[in-house]
Amino acid sequence: MANMNALQQMIFPDENAPIHRKKSVTAASVKSKGTVLGQKKPGGARKALNDITNKSGIHAKAAASSKNKQIASAAVKEIDIAGERFLHDHSKCIKEQQNLWDDHYSADLMLLHHGSSIKEKHLNWDIEKMDAKDDLTYEEPEEMASPKFSDWLKNSTPWRSPIRHGSMMPSTPLAWRFDSCEFTLKEDSDDLF
């Protein structure tokens, strides 16, 4: 059967899961110590596989050094907020960021390196455009004849509408068999190749 810890790890973890698990582990260890002391087996506790020593004093020193490391890491994790505010002035940071913005993203960069003269160019162009709108005289477009269309218009054959599908088309392809066709043979010319 699966271990309860393994089942808990399969469930989606939330932020507080490690805290609840640590409390339950410490509560279980307190209960189990009382029962283990009463039912102590001969031969002592089981040793780790990588432990090849026979002395129990080394384990106590290692445990003490690990506790000291945990206390030191907890002290490092504590942050002195008042000291941080004293060492770091946030208003200076804001001013520095604003200066960087002004230096790197100035109007010259935004307006494609044209500088301040770009405003003057736009003003002059707008004035010229307004003057052009005041003078609203446009020439009439001239009609230009196209040689293709003029050739079609000179054609002597009358214009016809396209043939509708059902009106003049023969009903079967066999009706086309009796139409007369004229074929003429042309001499081969070597000039084409």
From Swiss-Prot:
Q: Does the keyword Cell cycle apply?
A: yes
A GO CC term assigned to this protein in UniProt:
cytoplasm
- Tell me a GO biological process for this protein: positive regulation of maintenance of meiotic sister chromatid cohesion, centromeric
Q: What is the top-level taxon of the source organism?
A: Eukaryota
- Give compartment(s): Nucleus; Cytoplasm
Tell me which tissues or organs this protein is expressed in. Expressed in somatic and reproductive tissues. Expressed in inflorescence, young buds, roots and basal portion of young leaves. Expressed in proliferating cells such as apical meristems of roots and shoots, expanding cotyledons and leaves, root vascular tissues, and in stomatal precursor cells.
Tagged with keyword Cell cycle: yes
Q: What does this protein do?
A: Required for the maintenance of centromeric cohesion during interkinesis, until meiosis II. Required for regular configuration and segregation of sister chromatids in meiosis II. Also required for centromere cohesion during meiosis I. Involved in spindle organization at the end of telophase I and in meiosis II. Required to prevent precocious release of pericentromeric cohesins during meiosis, but not for cohesion establishment and monopolar orientation of kinetochores at meiosis I. Involved also in somatic development.
Fill in the subunit field for this protein. Interacts directly with the anaphase promoting complex/cyclosome (APC/C) through the CDC27B and CDC20-1 subunits.
- This chain belongs to the protein called Protein PATRONUS 1
Tell me the organism: Arabidopsis thaliana
Q: What is the lineage of its organism?
A: Eukaryota, Viridiplantae, Streptophyta, Embryophyta, Tracheophyta
